Amino acid sequence: MMPNRTSTTRFPITVDAALRAAGWQPGRWDIKQAEIWADTLRAHTTPGGHEHTVSPAAVECWAEFGGLRIAPKGPGRQLTPSTFRIDPLAGLHMARTLADLGRALETELCPLGEETTADTTAPQSLLAIDTEGRVYAIDHTGDWYLGPDIDAALTTLLSGAPPIRLTAG
């Protein structure tokens, strides 16, 4: 067990506090909204003909965390923790970008949400999830690996742990 967890929390204490402050609670599950997002993404085709991939891993994340704007509840370990929202429509027009990165990673990616500035909600990076549940961020400086699953990614974003930069080779 990690030292900053209690026996009753799924997440580290500061991550759990941020999630609960945003409206999350254990058992939260809005599959109806998740399916609406899935249908919207499936129906969208870019002018270049690119379409979104929708995976069960993405739908499950949207059902549990969708619609939440999550802000950190304390200082970061090594970086300033991120404020973000889980809303796949933030990536509606990013089908080609996600397809290109997915091809490089030999997987398929689906939009998850976006990192924002804490005070203005201006987008800073696109959050994406692959078919295995791994989570990534894509911004103007590059592509980043946030964790092997949504729990690890939330911890990375909210704790100020550095993400892993994706590089060629």
Predicted regions and their residues:
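A surface-exposed partner-binding patch
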Residues: M1-P123
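Short, surface-exposed charged micro-motifs
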Residues: S125-L127
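Short acidic-glycine loop/turn motifs at beta-strand connectors
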Residues: I129-E132
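Compact, glycine/acidic-enriched structural inserts
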Residues: Y136, T141-G169
